[in-house]
Amino acid sequence: MLVRHVLWLLAGLAPFAAAAPEKFRFERPLMGTRFSVICYADDRETAAAAAGAAFLVAEGVNEIASDYLPESELSRLSSRPLGEPVPLSPLLFDLLAHARALAEATGGAFDPTLGPLSKLWRETRERRRLPEPDRLEAARAAVGWRHFTLDPGARTITLRRENMAFDLGGVAKGYAADLMLESLADDGVPRSLIAAGGDIRLGEAPPGRDGWQVALRTFDSDRPDEILTLANAAVSTSGDLHQSVEIDGVTHSHILDPGTGLGLTRRIAASVVAASAKLSDPLATAACVLGDDGRELIADLPGVRAVKLRTPRDQPTPPAK
């Protein structure tokens, strides 16, 4: 009799059991690309509110750290006199400190001070003509990640080289994606994925699954090179995929070689799996610059889970870690 009553009680409660979370998708243009949020939530209203708040977080990062916006906090740094400590917002200080640490870790393969060269290369891509040697040398002379100092106690930056300018395009999207995921989780939507161009930040796995399936596509866009199952991680892919330009019969990537000041001429793509997108984003760029010689260096950095390099002719190379 007791069993019968228990079964009856459970049957009566069944209609009130929580419904399975639904999948929702939201998109918005940001930082020169398209940001997407894919998430699982109990209803569209909850998902839309959480995604909207996350997009606002990314917009805030862009307003501070964009080198395309002349009035951004980052852009205004280039007009400050040498040797003068400049107070920074908490976000920009944290972002620059992170970028500098990665510049040191990669031996300058990722360099946040490439602003003068980035601006010159944008002109070069439009004109489809290499820059004049004197302009290239002037831009190179203004670059160098060692030539600015940060004071954590005062939260200031001091520039040590004339005509310095920052370009955080290789880290800002990943940094924003990390903050977006935090925002979504804080709003009760931890089962989320953020895609920002070649950067993907993954939160908790979808309901009933081990992780999110991520297809890595590089030179053969019709079929994936590899399909990964990931949760609470990030993966970024960078390389000579969609933004190359041909000048005088030579194909140049949009990724700058800090050594030459010009776009890379070897065709290469790199995917980095890491604990956060603020790691995977810049390290994918650095992996392209360093090539196979730097793969082990990057794979050994804290938080890095895998480094994958590919060329148009090669089969996928095994991960270094």
Where are these regions (language model features)?
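Mature catalytic core of soluble alpha/beta enzymes
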Residues: 2-321
